[in-house]
Amino acid sequence: MADLRKHKIGWIGTGRMGFSMAARLLKKGAQVAVYNRTRAKAEPLAPLGAQLADSPAALADRDIVFTMVAGSGDLLEVVSGPKGLLSRAGRAPKILIDCSTISQEASAEARGAAAAAGCAMLAAPVSGNAKVVKAGRLSLVVSGSKDAYDEALPWLESLGEGVSYVGEGELSRIVKICHNVFLGVVTQSLAEITVLAEKAGVPRHAFLDFINKSVMGSTFSRYKTPAFVNLDFAPTFTPVLLRKDLDLGLAAARKHEVPMPLTAAVRELVQALIGNGYVDTDFAALLALEAKAARLELKPENVAVGDGLYT
């Protein structure tokens, strides 16, 4: 087992995902100092052993620094802004690892700034949410310097159960964008067929039980079953964030001349979801929008169903 105390770790961004990932590193024994724009969101990590930093720049002396922020502008601010990680001449971590879902262009800009400061950068976006992190089921896709990847691998592996290296540069960014496009399209499709089955008389829990046991069942369909059955839309990933990722996918499609009509349609449905007030809920609320369009009144079924994360 690798010694996770070999390098000092910095962590920038303790939202839902960043908090859970930093907490996992701490529980695995890593030495972690954390920064978050809203300090109160980072403070609960202190009892786990985290040091609290007052700015990203204060983490420049760490060996490896992870970032997990909401978007492209946020990453560039915490990396290259006035108090950014690389704002002090001659001070930079050895490796910067960004786990956010951002554009390839912003990632390349951050990578260039890191290289100018003598810092290697890995793009390492993730598949999962805070609950998945807690269950140890997070997956990461990584691109960048192979040497930096090999050095950082013990810390990457400690975050979850799967790490995939796909090559140099920003290749992992397009992989993650495609992943989240798939997430949106699959969720909309699952919402449509669930509403169809229920309106025809099949209880949601019975329909999804069959789907999950069939060849079409998946980790994801099982994970979203409790939300669909009992209408618990507590946010794991919001419609606003999904809209951002669908926009990234459509921008990449235009760049590479790839038609994506399903993605374009789902993007507008997510926009409608937001317009109907589903802003701080889970994106599984696409089910509610579909039911409304079908004039189906949804009610919680109050059936105990598993999410497949724990066996």
What are these regions (language model features)?
Residues 151, 171-294:
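Helical "substrate-binding/catalytic lid" subdomain
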Residues 21-22, 41, 110, 155, ...:
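Hydrophobic residues within alpha-helices
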Residues 1-60, 64-67, 94, 298:
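NAD(P)+-binding Rossmann beta1-loop-alpha1 motif at the extreme N-terminus of oxidoreductases
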Residues 101-181:
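Rossmann-fold dinucleotide-binding core
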Residues 32, 52, 121-122, 163, ...:
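Hydrophobic beta-strand scaffold residues
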Residues 56-119:
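Rossmann-fold NAD(P) dinucleotide-binding segment
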